[in-house]
Amino acid sequence: MITFIPRDKVSKNWTIIGPILSIFLTVFFGLLIFTFLGYNPLETLYQIFLSPFSRIDRISDILVKACPLIIVGIGLMLCFRANVWNIGAEGQFIMGTLLAGSFALLFPSVETKFFIFIMIVIGFIGGALWAFIPAILKTKLNVNEILVSLMLVYVAMLFIDFIVRGPLRDPMSFGFPLSKPYSEGAIINKIPFPGIGYLGQLHYGILFIILLIPISWLFVNKTLSGFKINVLGAAPKAAKFA
């Protein structure tokens, strides 16, 4: 039987060398695979690591794509602090966006931007309800949350694929799996820069992310609720009697 014994002291050198070595090996074997597939490894390296940062509009598009991922990461940070291994964030993100998007399609003529805040709340509710399934199975039946949350990702992917090809499909999509267009009030405006104009698709959502990061840090480290989450993860048995 294999047993794992934690070290008494963690090597300071390996805390630095470990991540660097992991990145190097990942890049090396990745380039090796691309080489076997017939691609130029140097061109592959450029396209993956340098090309996205070669133009300002490409950098802005990276920031746009990072916005929802950062929100998901903050949510997972709370889970991991509580020692809950939720790896179904992708499915929860899908169901949250599906619920928020479906709600927006119910009001095709709304123009006020306050509507976006309502969509955000509904999106959080949709993701939370999807996460509630592995949570209730874990707390009531002691079902492994890793397996359940992972399997629900594929359920969510298939479900949204069905929805955009069925109930939410735009009759004018010419057979493509596209939803009906959203109203002006359901779309986040792009940021205009003086003398430059718009930088790709960069929108005001990035400002929300900039505010959300320090707020999340303050919540986890400076509030009673954050302290409870930390205690739950560090000492779950003690947390039951708290």
What are these regions (language model features)?
Residues I2-I71, K113, I118:
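Membrane-interfacial amphipathic/re-entrant helices at transmembrane-helix boundaries
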Residues I33-L37, F53-F107, I120, F124-F132, ...:
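Single transmembrane alpha-helix segments in multi-pass membrane proteins
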Residues L63, V110-K113, K138-V143, R165-G175:
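A cytosolic-side transmembrane-helix exit/cap motif
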